[in-house]
Amino acid sequence: GGVQQKMLDSVNLISDLGSKKDLQNMIDSAEEKGIAVYLNGITNYAMDSGITDGFFVYTDAAKFVSQESAKLNVYDTVTYEKAEEDRDPFYLLKADLVYEMMDNLADAANGYHAGVSFSDIGYELSSDFYQKDPTSRQMAMEEQAEKLKSLDDNGTDIMINMGNDYAVAYADMVTNMDLEGTEYSIIDKKIPFYQLAIHGYVNYTGEALNLTQNTQNELLNSAEYGAGLAFTFMKESAFELQNTLYTEYFGADYSAWHDEMLEIYTRYNEELG
């Protein structure tokens, strides 16, 4: 778990955050208040955690055209160089392993009577050029949709990221939907065709208001496009993130945002609810 998740061959709680009973109590309490809880995980990728944690590069990672394992790196946004000294590389998983990880996460969520949230399903599609069992992006799309349909048919509540159309039909919630569009085109007006098509069929939000680069624009776009509001919070102070690799969460300090969040939600519900 956490921000550097290992391969999702099993779902274990972080003991510092509480026990299984604590998590179940939280979910039950939320349900009593009409709040849905989703357990989130990454299923397309894995850190090289080693064979003792269930990951073996040569059998579990997808392949490039060169037949090398699909090892991926984070790149520096300023220099465009690999951030090898700061960030550990990670691997794209083979397609059949991705669907196994989806089942593992869904089974864990169902065990707590919670929904399942996929960080990368319905958002990213990848090929696997393994010569003995290649997978095209078209095949991956069809297989992802089939797996999502199976989970949906079994009564599992599903949350996805971004919301590509092949996955939206099976989702109960879409987060981080792009409400802005490309900034590279010179255009006079924007028409939210996608949001017009799905509005009323699935709930969706834009980026977390406290993490986006322009909170006011994201809020106005949410109102215009019929989106819900999203925030990302943590209990600890933002100062805990200083000199770490995760300063993108600097705005996630709950205590710093509490009053403004309530004000935004209250006005949004009163004027648009």
Annotate each predicted stretch with a short phrase:
Residues 43-114, 122-273:
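Active-site-proximal substrate-binding groove within the catalytic cores of carbohydrate-active enzymes
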Residues 1-53, 57, 139-149:
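Aromatic- and glycine-enriched glycan-recognition loops and surfaces
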